[in-house]
Amino acid sequence: MKPYISVVIKPTLYCNESCSHCYHTPGERILGNISLETLDRLFEMVSNEYQSAWFIWHGGEPMTLPMSFYKSVMELEEKHFGKNTFRVGNTIQTNGTLLNRRFMAYCREKAINVGVSWEGPYNSVLRELDPEKAVSMLSDKDNRYSVSSTISAETALKQKELYRFFRDRGTNLSLSPVIPAGCARCGNTVPDPDDYIRGSIETFDEWLHDADSKIPLVPHYLYVLNYLGDPTPSDCAHTSCLTKWICVNPDGSIYPCAKACPEEFRMGNVNEISALSEAFSSEGFRRILAGSVARREKCASCEVYRYCNGGCSMDAY
């Protein structure tokens, strides 16, 4: 059996917001949820091929599904993985606006991590609704949670302010740029590369020398680990995520990433294969693997290559 895999599951592409940087255009945000039969089949394949797995419930907005859905999910996980918490874990990535005390209590009971997409004081730049009240409740109730902030053209030079905002709250934070896909292909949300780099360097310098900081700022924290000798350098928490990471859409189709993947990278469908190894033998996977190899060969002579590993296959541009 292989050691582990991370599986992003998009149980729905529907969302209660219309964020200007979303990977999915309004036409893609259709009603239609993943079936429990598809999940049952997926969990069976994962449990047969991997020692452990981490499931990330994404979207769309996963909280548009009722809590009864997630109770059924937990029952299916127990069916295939048993009660061994070392074999399986879960994170729900949400915009936070639909979180309530009842679901937070359920997450605590089942040790489900909560990831909230939130830009703090700059939230209105990209989003319509603000989850601050829900985030405060997560903190008060001792839920395991973290925040992901997306850096736009407007906030590229304000990353340091974002870091300070979340540092003062003691909130684990990850920063990532808007990528030119989906809704972000239109408008002016994608940050200027020079501004983004400048803002990132300023934030890294402050975080590195901040004696009061108790949060592992991502991706900067990973760069430090790489510098200190991590054997598998990357700007992704999953190192070279290819073969260790997949995304499953509501219809069961498999892609190598949760970000905006073109159809050419489609790796098959959960309902049409008997093992995940088939997905990793697909033409779609071979295409993204070839592109990754070509990019790394191009980047290999760069002095910082050993720390970033050529970047992410989906947003290195």
PLM region spans:
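Canonical Radical SAM [4Fe-4S] cluster-binding loop centered on the CxxxCxxC motif
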Residues: 2-37
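Short, positively charged
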Residues: 38, 219-229, 276-283
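Cysteine-centered iron-sulfur cluster-binding motifs in ferredoxin-type domains/subunits
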Residues: 11-18, 61-64, 299-301, 305-307
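Radical SAM enzyme [4Fe-4S]-AdoMet core and its adjacent flexible, acidic
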Residues: 126-251, 259-269
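Radical SAM/AdoMet-radical enzyme domain recognition
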Residues: 39-58, 65-182, 188-191
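Flexible mid-to-C-terminal extensions adjoining Fe-S/redox cofactors in radical SAM and related proteins
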Residues: 261-317
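Short cysteine/histidine-rich metal-coordination sites, predominantly Zn2+-binding motifs
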Residues: 34-42, 315-317
